[in-house]
Every structure is written in C-alpha cells, then in structure tokens.
Amino acid sequence: MKKILLTLLLALPFCMVAKAQDFRVGITGGYNLSSPSGYKSQSGFHVGVKGELGLPIVTKGLYMDFGLMLSSHGWKSPGYYYDGNYNPSAGEKPDKPSSGYTSDNKCTPYYLNIPIHIGYKFPVGRNVSLFINAGPYFNIGLFGKAKETITPDKGTATTKEMVGNVFSDKMLNRFDWGLGFRAGTEIARHIQLSIGYDWGMKNINKSGVDNKNRTFVASCAYMF
C-alpha cells in the first residue's frame, strides 16, 4: 500500500506537466545537519534535481515544489568511556584495549529523498521574491555504513567498519517519511536560496530504539 501511494504521489506532478504552462526544472544542492534525539549532530549534503509547477488556476503565486535528490544523513554517539573491565562472556569483543578507552560510533545512511510540497511566492522587488513551502517527504534508503572508532588511554585511535550496509544488515528501516518546510528568496527567477527543516515521523531504527530523522537544511538551486 505504501509503495502504491508513493508511486501515485510521484506520478501526479508529471501527469500535470503535460498541460501546465508554468513548469520549471532546476538543479539543487546544499548542506544537511542531522540531529536525531540522543545523538550528536552530523553534517551531510543533498544534491539532485527539482521541479516547480505553478498553480495559477487556484491563485496567483501558489505552486507545487518537488524533487529527487541523493541525501546523506546520520549521527554520532556521544562517546562512551570504558575502564577496560569488560567481560567477553557477556558478548563484549575481546579485541578492545585492556586499559581504558573511548568508543565513538558513527552511522552515515544515504537516501533517495523525494519532497512534495505546496508553496507560495510573493514579489518584494523587481527581481526578488520570497517564498515558503511545506509538505511531506519520502526517503528510500540506498546504502550507508556504520563505523566505530576506539581511542585507548594509551595508544593510537583505530577505526573499523561495524556494518557494511545499514539497510541490508537489518540496522535501519529502508523507508522513511516525514514533514518539512522551506523558506527563502528567489533572485531574477533563476537563483533560489533557502533554509528549512525536516521532521521524520517514522522510527528508522529496527532495534526498537526511538530514532527519527531530524534535519536542518540549507539549499541553493538554479532554475532553468
């Protein structure tokens, strides 16, 4: 059912394009700052294509905004300190230092990000407009790794791969969805600068730990 709904939502803008007079495409990219609860924030990026479909039949300035982007998310653990008194029989790995050490974990999943927003633009000058849009987004997990860095009290830090693919290895759910908004300015009808935020509504962690995507976004786009 989710796949059918997603397919219909993706097809809607393209079905409307055939009769639309106010349709534009462009390229977009920018910065992500992911900060799921309980973890340190991690920087990422997004890059891809976007489209805009004007809806003057409803009211002037109203439009649909949608995109197809590669987007990196993730998080870092706060850094847990161990005094070296681990117990191998309890499932702890014997390759850890016998002295005290700090364990830092980092997870970097990559998604196919599909936002579908409704927005409004209003001019504030001859070649400048302000805009705001909001709506759902859908994420489809593509690939990503989880790594652990061990920093002993004495010695050199080492990093090793814990999970080769966070989606295939049953660490994260492949499908995610949520709500987002963007606000920004458009210059000369071509250059768009915006900031926004995405609230994930689905728990992405398969272990049962409550872990939802929370992402600050800053973007730059060029519309043709």
Residue ranges and their predicted role:
Residues 31-35, 53, 70-74, 110-113, ...:
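Transmembrane beta-strands of outer-membrane beta-barrel pores
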Residues 23, 58-62, 189-195:
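Repeated loop/turn-to-beta-strand initiation elements of outer-membrane beta-barrel proteins
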Residues 21-23, 41-47, 108-114, 128, ...:
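Residues that define the transmembrane beta-barrel architecture of outer-membrane proteins
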Residues 53-59, 122-126, 187-189, 224:
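Outer-membrane beta-barrel strand-turn architecture
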Residues 35-41, 73-110, 141-176:
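Extracellular/periplasm-exposed beta-strand and loop segments of Gram-negative cell-envelope proteins
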Residues 185, 212-224:
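Outer-membrane beta-barrel "beta-signal"
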Residues 19-54, 141, 150, 223:
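Short glycine/proline- and aromatic-enriched beta-strand/turn motifs that initiate or cap beta-hairpins
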Residues 27, 47-51, 68, 114-118, ...:
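Membrane-embedded beta-strands of outer-membrane beta-barrel proteins
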